[in-house]
Amino acid sequence: MTGSLEKEITLTFLRNFRDSPVLLKEYGPYLSYHYKVVANDGELSLNAVRICEELFNDWQNGDHTIAKEVVQCALDMWFVMKGEEYDLKGFEYIPNLIIQEIDVAKGKNTGEIHRIEFHPSTNEPIDEPLNNLILEEVEVHDFI
């Protein structure tokens, strides 16, 4: 991307920053890229800091009509620009992990089309193929 086009796209991103549907739909896959472009350009960085500070002040002053996703994006952009977390009071962090517990033993065929699995040695259909499924809970921080 050329410098001026890249800057114009990033300026459009910053102008629409508080508009959650536009932000998340149009820029979603490219958010981290735009954060880096903003952090590396002095003019864009000053503009982004002003936008983030206004948004954070509005949030702390009780304007909770701002979408949480937008606040989270502002916090993420702040971190990329400043290299440190912004301590935003009254905001609950939105994790990027989906944690869901299910009991696979209770899974039954409800008449939906499903894949039939066969035993590898007898080639007979397996009645409950999930019975041999092993699920293991792993703490991510153990691997970091």
Curated annotation (Swiss-Prot):
Any GO BP: tRNA processing
**Keyword terms:** Nucleus
Q: Where in the cell is it found?
A: Nucleus, Nucleolus
Asked if the keyword Electron transport belongs to this entry, the reply reads no
- Which one Pfam family would you cite for this protein? Swm2
Q: Name one GO cellular component term.
A: nucleolus
Highest taxon, organism lineage: Eukaryota
Leader sequence range is: none
Family membership, please give it.
Belongs to the SWM2 family.
Q: What is this protein called?
A: Nucleolar protein SWM2
Could you tell me which species this protein originates from? Answer: Vanderwaltozyma polyspora (strain ATCC 22028 / DSM 70294 / BCRC 21397 / CBS 2163 / NBRC 10782 / NRRL Y-8283 / UCD 57-17)
